[in-house]
């Protein structure tokens, strides 16, 4: 598979939501406990602009197989040069380098959108994601112990970061 990405659009939302929703049962990736609707993702999509907070998708044979979003951190002007990254890969396409590809592209693109600090918020038990971000130069910047409860189990949230 030749890796390329493009800007995500409204017509991509069903597949973006499908990939996201498929991660919910694992209780490793998101704090959402129920599937999200396509309609509920429209305001989220509208927060993403190619110039400041891109949303990218990777396609294979016309089907979205991974996506990455840059999101504003904490919504205050002083944090405008900081962005949170979220990466989601279709279950059938994991372990093929898509997450690494998207993160590398995000790191390289950050200066063009005036971002110099990238963050990830990852559950402490999500070892694959922690390892992925670690391989790409992200360090553990903080931990919020037992801030999430998933199926009666308290989970830590790890904050990873990297300057670019």
What would you call each of these model-derived segments?
Residues 17-45:
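Conserved GNAT-fold acetyl-CoA-binding loop/helix
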Residues 4-16:
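A short beta-loop-alpha structural element at the N-terminal edge
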Residues 110-122:
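Conserved GNAT acetyl-CoA-binding A-motif
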Residues 95-108, 127-135:
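Conserved acetyl-CoA-binding loop-helix of GNAT-fold acetyltransferases
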Residues 8, 89, 122:
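Hydrophobic adenine-recognition pocket in adenosine-nucleotide-binding enzymes
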């Amino acid at each position: 598979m030749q890796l390329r990405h493009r800007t995500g659009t409204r017509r991509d939302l069903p597949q973006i939501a499908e990939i996201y929703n498929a991660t919910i049962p694992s209780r490793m990736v998101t704090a959402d406990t129920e599937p999200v609707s396509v309609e509920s993702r429209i305001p989220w999509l509208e927060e993403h602009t190619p110039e400041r907070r891109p949303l990218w998708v990777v396609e294979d044979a016309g089907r979205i197989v991974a996506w990455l979003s840059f999101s504003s951190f904490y919504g205050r002007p002083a944090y405008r040069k900081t962005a949170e990254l979220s990466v989601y890969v279709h279950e059938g396409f994991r372990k093929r380098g898509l997450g690494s590809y998207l993160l590398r592209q995000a790191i390289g693109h950050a200066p063009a959108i005036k971002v110099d600090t990238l963050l990830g918020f990852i559950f402490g038990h999500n070892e694959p994601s922690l390892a992925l971000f670690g391989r790409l130069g992200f360090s553990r910047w903080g931990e919020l112990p037992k801030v999430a409860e998933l199926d009666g189990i308290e989970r830590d949230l790890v904050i990873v970061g990297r300057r670019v």
